[in-house]
Amino acid sequence: MKKVLFILAIIIVIVGIFLVLRPRVSASKGATDGGKILVAYFSATGNTKAVAEKLADATGADLFEITPEQLYTDEDLNWQNDQSRSSIEMASRYSRPAIASKIENIAQYNVVFVGFPIWWGREPSIIDTFMESYDFAGKIIVPFATSGTSGIGDSGANMQSLVPNAHVRGGERFPVDVSVSELKTWASEQM
């Protein structure tokens, strides 16, 4: 009986040491391993921008707008017109609209939230351009989207295929009126 108690005590001590010494991820530091957080977003109508600003506020992140070289007009965004710019871009998985804005030092970020509206059940092609424009190896990528009714679909899987050495989360769709506290809770679960 004494042997059993002795072995049990040793196991408890070992587990206790493991729990005390294990590395921790702290959202309050701004990211894992002391790195920073970036909220990058593309917003055609302003809804994703509104959520991105709240998310940056909730996480203490830097904010970056993914701006297309050629801005989208209302006609470009007419999803009911098969000949609209957005319809043509989304018809091909290989479409890569040019981006006018650039992140100077992506290496400083360990966590990158990437926001976008849902187009045709997935991320817009300009997000694919963004994902292929930087080295995201080892970074946590967290998609978030805005949409009236559509879910985020397979956007996370699509993005993971573009940056196979990153850790892309499944992502979430939010209404434009999501609160900062809701975003803070969600974001802390992603990092």
Model regions and ranges:
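Active-site-proximal alpha-helix that buttresses catalytic centers in soluble enzyme cores
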Residues: 3-7, 16-191
